[in-house]
A protein has these predicted regions:
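Calcium-regulated, polybasic anionic-phospholipid
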Residues: 28-54
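Tryptophan-paired
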Residues: 44-85
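Exposed beta-strand and adjacent loop surfaces of beta-rich binding modules
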Residues: 20-22, 36-40, 97-103
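Intrinsic-disorder/low-complexity, polar/charged segments enriched in Ser/Thr/Lys/Arg/Asp/Glu/Gln
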Residues: 20-22, 59-63, 78, 147-151
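Bacterial Sec-dependent N-terminal signal peptides
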Residues: 1-24
Length: 157
């Protein structure tokens, strides 16, 4: 008679099933974005109310482990970042080149019951087309108003 190390009274656990999900978000933006825009990131899971943070000069990074100690892994993770022109804008120097660049990375990693991890989704982007904007184009860019940087969601399967 042989007994398993973790006991026979436990329910059978599927080793490949996810027991938690780690989500990494990061945003890095140029100083001009921070000077001219308010950048707000909202993030969360499923249909829960979003958490909101402001992105500053140092950027914004968040790592969240969903599912640990919870009865289930979330069905969906999401993150949305919006930049809105500030109410009080700095003076635009028409001779200067401006950079309205925002880089972001988002990774969703599944942690399985057997201890293995798997990448469920990876997203990264940069917008180099607005890295060298002439000063005489800045007001036109600001007049676009609120801009969505990213609207990301991923269903966990």
């Amino acid at each position: 008679f042989f007994a398993s190390c973790d006991g026979n009274d436990k329910e059978d656990v599927n080793p490949a099933e996810l027991n938690s999900v780690i989500v990494n978000y990061s945003f890095i933006q140029s100083d001009d974005v921070v000077d001219f825009y308010d950048v707000i990131v909202s993030y969360g899971i499923d249909e829960e109310e979003a958490n909101c943070d402001t992105v500053g000069f140092d950027g914004w990074t968040m790592e969240i482990n969903y599912g640990v100690g919870e009865p289930t892994v979330p069905n969906k993770v999401y993150c949305k970042a919006i930049m809105t022109p500030k109410a009080q804008l700095p003076t635009i120097d028409l001779e200067k080149k401006y950079s309205f660049k925002v880089d972001y990375n988002m990774n969703v990693i599944g942690c399985r019951n057997d201890g293995q991890t798997t990448i469920l989704k990876m997203v990264s982007n940069t917008n180099p087309n607005i890295a060298n904007m002439p000063g005489n184009k800045v007001q036109e860019y600001l007049d676009k108003g609120e801009q969505i940087i990213v609207d990301f969601s991923h269903e966990i399967k």
